[in-house]
């Protein structure tokens, strides 16, 4: 297991560099209606990036994992065209991010679970959001990249979480063979968070990750068997059974293999 780092909001895989402090679009005069409107718009646009809170970002980094936004930054150095679920003052950061990004001059549809919010779980709204991205990729004939880091269905939503998976499954199967879909498995994925991405064209799994219908704790409680997560759903066992197509050393290596 990798050595855990101290709590930090910095990307654990990023190179150290000096950043000059600046305030974007700073207005030195007395703010008027225009400045207030710009400020409100910027707050709405930035809300998904910060809604998780510093503590949840630190928890993600303590597990030696990147946030979904840091993973997108590895795939492209250009600003992603984020596909928001809705607009308005109530817009918040969903547990699923969908976007169109530019990778070496080519448009790519990408989604990523935000584990810092509801452990990346899925509900009906996110299922519909994911299905729309699949359909968009199929219509535009562009590749699809999935960055999976999800605990599965959002239990408090009841059957709504399962409805979301049903819609996403249907949409993904419709574009199968039409456009390539490359799925990356990050973190600890369970339930629908594990079997939906396996429907993709290729699956990449880094070391120290897991995906399976359930984890070791449930196996212990139901079958009375002790088993490690790596032996149950790690890259070693999945690559031997053919579930995982490509293994990688870590998240960054996996994302570079995508490119």
Language-model-derived ranges and their functions:
Residues 116-125, 157-162:
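Flexible beta-alpha connector loops of hexameric P-loop NTPases
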Residues 3-4, 148-259:
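Conserved catalytic cores of soluble enzyme domains
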Residues 100-114, 129-156:
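A structural preference for short, pocket-lining loop segments at secondary-structure junctions
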Residues 93-97, 128-132, 167-168, 188:
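Short alpha-helical segments and helix-capping/turn motifs at coil-helix boundaries
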Residues 94-98, 107, 142-143, 169, ...:
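Short glycine-rich loop/turn motifs
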Residues 109, 122-126, 147, 164-167:
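Glycine-rich phosphate- or other oxyanion-binding loops that anchor nucleotides, phosphorylated ligands
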Residues 119-127, 186, 227:
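Alpha-helix N-cap/helix-initiation motif
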Residues 1-108, 112-119, 248-259:
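Intrinsically disordered, low-complexity segments enriched in small/flexible residues
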């Amino acid at each position: 297991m990798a050595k855990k780092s101290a709590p930090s909001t910095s990307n654990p895989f990023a190179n150290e560099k000096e950043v000059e402090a600046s305030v974007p679009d700073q207005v030195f005069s007395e703010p008027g209606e225009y400045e207030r409107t710009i400020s409100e718009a910027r707050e709405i646009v930035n809300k998904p990036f910060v809604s998780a809170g510093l503590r949840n970002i630190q928890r993600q980094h303590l597990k030696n994992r990147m946030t979904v936004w840091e993973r997108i930054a590895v795939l492209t150095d250009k600003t992603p065209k984020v596909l928001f679920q809705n607009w308005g003052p109530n817009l918040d950061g969903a547990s699923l991010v969908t976007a169109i990004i530019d990778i070496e001059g080519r448009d790519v549809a990408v989604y990523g679970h935000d584990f810092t919010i509801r452990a990346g779980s899925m509900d009906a709204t996110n299922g519909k959001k994911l299905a729309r991205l699949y359909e968009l990729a199929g219509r535009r004939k562009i590749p699809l990249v999935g960055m999976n880091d999800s605990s599965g269905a959002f239990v408090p939503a009841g059957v709504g979480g399962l409805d979301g998976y049903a819609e996403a499954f249907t949409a993904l199967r419709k574009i199968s063979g039409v456009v390539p879909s490359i799925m990356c498995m990050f973190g600890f994925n369970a339930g629908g968070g594990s079997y939906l991405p396996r429907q993709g064209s290729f699956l990449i799994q880094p070391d120290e990750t897991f995906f399976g219908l359930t984890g070791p704790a449930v196996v212990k409680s139901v079958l009375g068997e002790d088993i490690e997560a790596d032996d149950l759903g790690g890259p070693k066992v999945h690559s031997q059974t053919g579930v995982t197509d490509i293994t990688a050393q870590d998240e960054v290596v996996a994302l570079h293999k995508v490119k």
